[in-house]
């Protein structure tokens, strides 16, 4: 089904790559758009006007002036979309901005999956993972899958993913795990793109916190990025004298629990800007953060760095996996 936001932007787009081309392009008015055969007597003018106003506020659509006549009160305005990008439109960014977080949650529901584990102590637990960059790469928090004797990952239809490898950073303070899926259970699932986070931007988290008496289901939380915090070299942050070497984290003013570990943090454009993690600290500090209701996320740049194998070969270790009846296990 055609998307009205993308159709508006494509209609009013101009090629700004060459100044001589810009001068030759004829600007179009709102009347030109609404007079198209497919919209005559069918266009929802309230929705159309709302989308136009949002795109203007976002700086994606610009007014090019007023024509001397028109069939409707607003129809004589000329509009220009100078930075329209077909790839951005296909990803859904423009539509996400006009339709809000609900449309993002609907579009990426299948890309965010529960990761159910059985620990070495035979205790069940749950975390979250998400597709990033392609149909075969699932990102989660390291502590979700590390030391598990059984890991279950399925698509939205309940079909089991077969896993070839799991990649861990060699620095165990980095709470990132990369799961490489071998089969095509996510072939029809939309994956996330990654961009950098910004302070105070509004974000959405999608995760699977365990709630007694219920099967795993997605919960949504809208919040904002409050601040970034960078551990300085050699700072002691736990009783075990763990040191973090210049690792940057962001603070989220959303209360995140258990199964939210590994949840993607998503901005208004539908891009993944980071992941909910745990950081090494003593129990007293952890309780303080928990009571404040904050979440901690690692930024997308840290995740992308390890997707490429790290800056040096010794930055990561690749573990082969054995696929069994109800999931897979990591061979160590």
Language-model segments: residues:
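A short, conserved structural fragment
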Residues: 56-68
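C-terminal subregion of chymotrypsin/trypsin-like serine protease catalytic domains
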Residues: 63-64, 267-332
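Short amphipathic alpha-helical interface segments
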Residues: 1-42
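Short amphipathic alpha-helical interaction segments
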Residues: 41-57
